[in-house]
């Protein structure tokens, strides 16, 4: 299988809705118990692409395999140098086939280039595959919130994994919005997609 990456568009919202909805209903990978509607997902894509990368993985036939994106960690502006990551594979996508790794090989260097200092992923403690993926990219556990969520009749623990991308300059340059460097991401994706 060949994994191809591209930048998301609002037209991807139905696929993202269906994928995320699977995890909302059938897993504890997200603590969300309600899947936003398709238009909400489309709005999120439009909004996030202003500042953050939002990537889609497909196979050589164009079949949707999954997505990864960055978003604000918290709404307060003092947190603007930290991005929170989301990554989900389509329910029928093959596991342990490199989809998540390829998405992060594109996403993390680009967030570094934009000037983010840290990225954070909040992962359910029982999601060993996601924990292993993040560890393999140099994420470390920053916090463990025991029984911080309740879903499907059970208490769940969340693990906060953090990776430093850039130094903590006392006078950091502003984050470069994604809209201003999208062409660079297109070039990076073309190079990654050309790899065997």
For the regions a protein language model found, what residue spans apply to each?
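A short beta-loop-alpha structural element at the N-terminal edge
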Residues: 4-16
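Conserved GNAT-fold acetyl-CoA-binding loop/helix
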Residues: 17, 21-44
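Acetyl-CoA-dependent GNAT
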Residues: 36-94, 104-105, 164-166
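Conserved catalytic-core motifs of GNAT/GCN5-like acyltransferases
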Residues: 69, 120-123, 135, 140-157, ...
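Conserved acetyl-CoA-binding loop-helix of GNAT-fold acetyltransferases
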Residues: 96-109, 132-136
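Short, charged, solvent-exposed linker or helix-capping segments at domain edges/interfaces
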Residues: 97-98, 169-179
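Conserved GNAT acetyl-CoA-binding A-motif
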Residues: 111-123
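Short, cationic low-complexity segments
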Residues: 174-196
């Amino acid at each position: 299988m060949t994994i191809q990456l591209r930048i998301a568009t609002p037209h991807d919202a139905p696929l993202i809705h269906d994928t995320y909805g699977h995890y909302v209903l059938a897993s504890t990978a997200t603590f969300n118990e309600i899947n936003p509607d398709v238009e909400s997902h489309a709005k999120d894509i439009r909004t996030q692409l202003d500042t953050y990368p939002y990537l889609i993985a497909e196979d050589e036939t164009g079949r949707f395999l999954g997505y990864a994106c960055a978003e604000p960690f918290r709404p307060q502006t003092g947190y603007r140098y930290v991005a929170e990551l989301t990554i989900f594979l389509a329910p029928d996508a093959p596991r342990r086939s490199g989809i998540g790794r390829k998405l992060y090989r594109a996403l993390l260097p680009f967030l570094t280039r934009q000037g983010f200092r840290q990225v954070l992923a909040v992962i359910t403690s029982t999601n060993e595959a996601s924990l292993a993926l993040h560890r393999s990219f140099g994420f470390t556990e920053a916090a463990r919130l025991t029984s911080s969520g309740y879903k499907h009749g059970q208490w769940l623990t969340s693990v906060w994994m953090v990776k430093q991308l850039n130094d903590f300059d006392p006078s950091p340059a502003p984050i470069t919005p994604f809209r201003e460097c999208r062409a660079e991401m297109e070039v990076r994706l073309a190079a990654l997609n050309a790899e065997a």
